[in-house]
Swiss-Prot record:
Location of the GST N-terminal domain: 17-101
Membrane-crossing residue ranges in chain numbering: none
Protein name in UniProt: Glutathione S-transferase 2
Keyword set, alphabetical order: Transferase
Length: 233
């Protein structure tokens, strides 16, 4: 649809909902929501407001009033409702058209997707993030007020173990949570994007993971995201 908004379904009745997303275009966590929006053909309908993490804008009172955790992305609806956390935002946008494609349709699909999505966070994406913030310059000394290099390096090793785990998974099936692309795939993609930023290479022996990621990079939603990252970096 044209304009800044989506047609959503409320008891079978179509309603228009305007949305703002606060993020940073090059961010791996915002990448999760941007890929999901592209998969749902909603990317061009959202108003994006850039938050400069390197200047610490996510720690300022005006942003903390929107998200106590001080993280991006954050979704703001036209009634003032604020939704933070990538999984929650993805759940919301996936259900807007009444036909969820990323978070599962059946209880079984939902359970497996959420399990694998959480594993992608715990075993790959979040450890890479900790490595970035603690064992590299991160966002710079004005933002990174406390660093524990030893902890960061341990999390780097955890991320590498996570890559081996997902390689094992992808030797058995085409996608992270089964036979179709889902939110769990998006989270692994974000983890590998972040790994590339911090120059943490996928091990050569993880052939299935490497082949899967090469295939995912050809997916239109991921291609679009990588173009956005390239222009904003």
């Amino acid at each position: 649809m044209n304009g800044r908004g989506f047609l959503i379904y409320n008891g079978g009745e179509k309603m228009k909902q305007k949305m703002i997303i606060y993020d940073t275009p090059a961010g791996p966590y915002p990448a999760r929501v941007r890929i999901a929006l592209a998969e749902k053909n909603m990317l061009s309908s959202v108003q994006f407001v850039r938050i400069n993490l390197w200047k610490g804008e996510h720690k300022k009172p005006e942003f903390l009033a929107k998200n106590y955790s001080g993280t991006v992305p954050v979704l703001e609806l036209d009634d003032g409702t604020l939704i933070a956390e990538c999984t929650a935002i993805t759940e919301y946008i996936d259900a807007l058209d009444g036909t969820p494609t990323l978070t599962g349709k059946t209880p079984l699909e939902k359970g497996v997707i959420h399990m694998m999505n959480k594993r992608a966070e715990l075993e790959l994406l979040d450890p890479v993030s900790v490595y970035f913030h603690h064992a590299t310059p991160g966002l710079g000394p004005e933002v990174e007020l406390y660093q524990n290099k030893e902890w960061g390096l341990r999390q780097r090793d955890k991320a590498l173990h996570g890559m081996h785990y997902f390689d094992t998974v992808l030797r058995e099936r085409p996608y992270v949570a089964g036979d179709s692309f889902s939110m769990a795939d998006i989270t692994v993609i974000a983890g590998l994007i972040f790994a590339a930023i911090v120059k943490l290479q996928v091990p050569e022996e993880c052939e299935a993971l490497r082949a899967w990621y090469k295939r995912m990079q050809q997916r239109p939603s991921v291609k679009k995201l990588l173009e956005i990252r390239s222009k904003s970096s």
